[in-house]
């Protein structure tokens, strides 16, 4: 995995389908709220168990830094409404004297959803936002040590980090993308300030992550040019991507960027304007806009690639034979010379047949061997 991530050629094409959430939770046999609410087991442990079950090359992205922040934070559960299908958990919180509320819906057999988000108004809540994006002052490595030990040699150990932009902020604001778009044009000075605050926090986080020496760092930016236009992404997101990847390059730690949805333009920027090592998931149309062979031809000398079997048409609704054909096609398109990790075009659905994942692994371990 690390050789491929660094755009080198290993003994075979690594295989790491994206199943970081729903499939590991399903394999526990428990209601999903046991995993997401009670952390029994924690999701990261369920993922490692899934890697063992399927025999994939582990792509661990949940390294928990337990950052310390210079702020006072209190949280209490105000109300829980339970049915056999869902638990709706409402929390009251105080961050440095600034109160807010949030609500999370935990489902029996689906990933949770934030049904009330903490920040309601950009201008009214600007003090809360400034406290939200304070840089950390330290971290606690205790869970990192436990996670590394549990993963062992099953895969590569990664820590994720976000960066400024609508793709991150929409999960914080009750009005979501609609409000962010209006504020971008009507209150641009506050959006610009939030970008600077978020970048300052991310750079401090990255310095500590690099001190912890993971195998790689994942820049987590799902929808970077899908949830905002490329022009907005260049203003809000790209400068921080450049700084984060440069820091990691200087430290000798490879970086990968995950951004589902459209990604062709983002791949161009990353190849030509950043120090990024690897990009994923390079989704095909209509969800994305990438052709694996074209991306390999245009940017394969600078970027390792990870992707990109269709998560619904092939992995969820297809047969093992369909998976085998698509996997061979992906290896043919991007496997030459290394620098390729066989994966899916984003998260596999909960009901993806186990047989299809087993077939993907089989193809990588047979057809994906370099001679």
Where are these regions (language model features)?
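Active-site loop segments of alpha/beta catalytic cores
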Residues: 1-39, 110-371
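Ligand-binding clamshell of periplasmic/extracellular solute-binding protein-like
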Residues: 16-24, 51, 55-68
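A contiguous, low-structure linker/loop signature
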Residues: 68-128, 154
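Short, glycine/charge-rich beta-strand/loop segments that flank catalytic centers
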Residues: 61-75, 163-166
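Catalytic domains of carbohydrate-active enzymes, especially glycoside hydrolases
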Residues: 43-62, 208, 212
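Short, low-complexity intrinsically disordered segments
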Residues: 31, 42, 57, 85, ...
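Short polar/acidic secondary-structure junctions
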Residues: 61, 80-81, 284
């Amino acid at each position: 995995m690390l050789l491929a991530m660094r755009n080198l050629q290993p003994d075979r094409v690594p295989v790491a389908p994206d199943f970081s959430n729903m499939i590991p939770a399903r394999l526990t046999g428990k209601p999903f709220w046991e995993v997401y609410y009670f952390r029994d087991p924690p999701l990261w442990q369920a993922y490692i168990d899934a890697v063992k079950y399927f025999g994939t090359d582990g792509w661990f992205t949940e390294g928990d830094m337990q950052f310390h922040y210079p702020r006072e934070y209190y949280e209490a559960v105000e109300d829980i409404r339970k049915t056999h299908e869902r638990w709706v958990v409402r929390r009251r919180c105080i961050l440095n004297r600034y109160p807010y509320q949030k609500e999370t819906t935990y489902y029996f057999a689906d990933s949770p959803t934030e049904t009330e988000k903490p920040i309601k108004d950009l201008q009214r809540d600007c003090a809360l936002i400034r406290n939200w994006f304070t840089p950390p002052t330290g971290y606690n490595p205790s869970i990192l040590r436990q996670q590394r030990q549990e993963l062992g040699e099953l895969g590569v150990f990664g820590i994720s980090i976000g960066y400024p932009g609508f793709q991150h902020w929409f999960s914080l604001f009750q009005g979501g993308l609609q409000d962010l778009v209006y504020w971008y044009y009507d209150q641009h000075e506050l959006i610009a300030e939030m970008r600077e605050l978020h970048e300052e926090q991310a750079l401090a986080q990255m310095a500590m992550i690099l001190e912890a020496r993971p195998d790689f760092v994942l820049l987590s930016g799902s929808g970077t040019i899908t949830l905002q236009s490329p022009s907005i992404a260049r203003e809000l997101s790209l400068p921080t991507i450049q700084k984060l990847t440069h820091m990691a390059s200087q430290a000798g730690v490879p970086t990968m960027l995950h951004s589902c949805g459209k990604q062709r333009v983002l791949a161009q920027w990353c190849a030509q304007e950043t120090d990024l090592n690897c990009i994923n998931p390079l989704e095909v149309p209509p969800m994305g806009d990438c052709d694996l062979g074209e991306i390999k031809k245009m940017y394969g000398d600078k970027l390792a690639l990870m992707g990109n079997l269709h998560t619904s048409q092939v992995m969820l609704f297809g047969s093992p034979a369909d998976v085998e054909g698509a996997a061979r096609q992906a290896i043919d398109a991007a496997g030459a010379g290394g620098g390729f990790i066989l994966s899916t075009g984003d998260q596999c659905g909960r009901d993806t047949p186990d047989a299809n994942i087993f077939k993907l692994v089989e193809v990588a371990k047979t057809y994906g061997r370099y001679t």
